[in-house]
Every structure is written in structure tokens, then in C-alpha cells.
């Protein structure tokens, strides 16, 4: 009997890797439904190959005459609200949320409250709304398996260890494309340079985040909410080879390391099959192929956004929500060539400084904080606060 999967964000890098896994295991899984934001050509290709029950184009301004309302047996839905309809479908058993940004929140909550198993790759949902999402996960006893390579690695390690023996969890980071540049050189990084990553093929926003290690900061906050580990016991190391994806340090001084070829098919396959083991290798890669492995601590002068993430996480309340929203707004300005790469963390810092930290209890309150933080970034830009410093 095949397991029905709903894939949100099918046209992105995680979505494409998920489709690779589904192709490798046609007897085990079938694509029940999927979404794209606005890539209609990609949507047509996926529909033709997998013939799912539903297809959602989340961009409400998309030209509806291109795909219409039905292709073969596939119903075509439009708008962000339709994402929730997909995951609530009774036949859906597993939901993979690979949508970038806080837009992934409502479909993630819909999956949690509908009793679906959740493979979460949308880190912004936990970063922005962590306490609220965790309370819903506990209430509905939802099984959540992280899809990000680092969190999936830590998930597998922690599942196999006695939690009382754990001293610290460590996320690895490639260091991005600019790890060898001086701090002075970073000020002149171009958009074209920032959209290149040495290891992973990702979308523009995540690539920019990764090159400034703000992405790793988001992952630190996500790890806190996923695993319940205090920030003082979460570490980050730069590991350029991207072979080791997660490290668990034990109280006795020993460490366990999860290592694999840097390919998203490994964590995705694990999240789909869990708690059963993945039945066959998708890509052979042994220790003799690793070569030299290097690890070192990140320089927070080079990566100030990482330090800000730890500060926001420790502050708690709405601070992570403000951090994420300010970053998304600042990255958007950078991609429009309106601010420098090195100004992104400055906008985050000033937004955190200008906004009070609250402790909301409702989704609407969190969303209002998110909205105000984005508006604050634009106000800072208009007032030339950052560039004046």
C-alpha cells in the first residue's frame, strides 16, 4: 500500500529533491498533491509526470488561463488559502512543507491540526511562531520529522542516544561563498556573488541567508524549538566540506557525528520512511571518499547575523519573529540592489532595537508583530538610519 504525500513548494530545491525520492520509491509513495508559487511551466511538468489529485498555484495573481481549473484528473487551485485545503485532504498522510518564508505557517498548522505526519523544511514557521506551533504539536500529538539536513542529522542522532547523556548539539555550516573574504571585502559583495553557494543549490533568499550565516542563525532557533535544547547548549561550527551535518557532544567527552554526501535526498528519504529505515541506498558514499574534513568556530565579526540570532533566541517572546521578518525584508531590499550585503544584519539589529519584545498567545498577534517588523525595516530605509551610521 502506497503512502500519499502532499508536497508544498515543489518547484524549489527541496521540492525537486523530494520528487527525486518519490521517483526512486514508486511502490512506497505517491504524490497526492503539490504546490508551486508562480512557476506554471514547472507545475505543468510535475502534473504530467505524477498526475496528482490536486495542484495549487499559491500566487493569487497568476494567469489562471494557463493551467485552467483542471488538467486531466488533477484539480487546479489558486491562492495561499488553497495550501491549507491540500493538506487537509483526508487521503493525505504525509505533508512536506518546503515553502520558503512565513507564508508556510498556515498550511503547517493545518497539517498539524489535521493529524498529518509532517516533514518540515520551512524553518521560518518554527522560528517565527515556535511557542505557538509547539503547543499545537503537543496538543494534537503530531509526528514532526525535520527535513533540513542539519536538523534531520541531529534528529537521527538524538533518537539513538540517551538524552540524559547529551551535553551539546552542534550544527555545521559551510561558511558560504565569502568565508575567505576579509570583513572589509564583504562590504563590496554584489548580488550576483551572493546568489552563488559553494555546496547547495538553493533559491535566492536562502542562498543570501546562507552566505551571511543568517540561515544558520535561523536554524539555531529552529533547533531550540525542535529539540528543546537551551541556546547555551547549541553550537555552530564551520565545516567547508559539508560532509558532517550534525554533531552531538556527550557529557563523557565523546561525540557522535552524522555524515553523508551533501544531497537533500538523504534527509528527505528519512523523513518519508520514518520510523522505518530507508530500504536501499540512494547514493553510495563511504568514509574513504570523505577526504580532509575541517572544522572551526565562526567569526561573529564576519557573521554578525549569527550572533544576533542567538541574542534573539535567548530573548524569547517575539524577538525571533522580529529577527526573521526583519531579515526577510532586508534580503528583499538587497535583492533589489537597494542596500549592501553587509547592511542586512544592521537592519535586523535596528528593528530588534526599535520594537518591544512581547509574549503573544495567538497567531494573529504574532502575525501583527511580523507585519510591523517588515514595515520597520522599510521605515529605517526611508529614514536612512543604517546608511547614516
From Swiss-Prot:
GO BP terms, alphabetized: isopentenyl diphosphate biosynthetic process, methylerythritol 4-phosphate pathway involved in terpenoid biosynthetic process
Cofactor annotation: Mg(2+); Mn(2+)
Enzyme class: oxidoreductase
Annotated keywords: Isoprene biosynthesis, Manganese, Metal-binding, NADP, Oxidoreductase
Keyword Nucleotide-binding assigned: no
Binding site for Mn(2+): 148, 150, 219
Keyword Oxidoreductase: yes
Binding site for 1-deoxy-D-xylulose 5-phosphate: 123, 149-150, 174, 197, 210, 215-216, 219
GO molecular function: 1-deoxy-D-xylulose-5-phosphate reductoisomerase activity; manganese ion binding; NADPH binding
Entry-linked SUPFAM superfamilies: 1-deoxy-D-xylulose-5-phosphate reductoisomerase, C-terminal domain (SSF69055), Glyceraldehyde-3-phosphate dehydrogenase-like, C-terminal domain (SSF55347), NAD(P)-binding Rossmann-fold domains (SSF51735)
Function: Catalyzes the NADPH-dependent rearrangement and reduction of 1-deoxy-D-xylulose-5-phosphate (DXP) to 2-C-methyl-D-erythritol 4-phosphate (MEP).
HAMAP family: DXP_reductoisom
Identification of the protein by name: 1-deoxy-D-xylulose 5-phosphate reductoisomerase
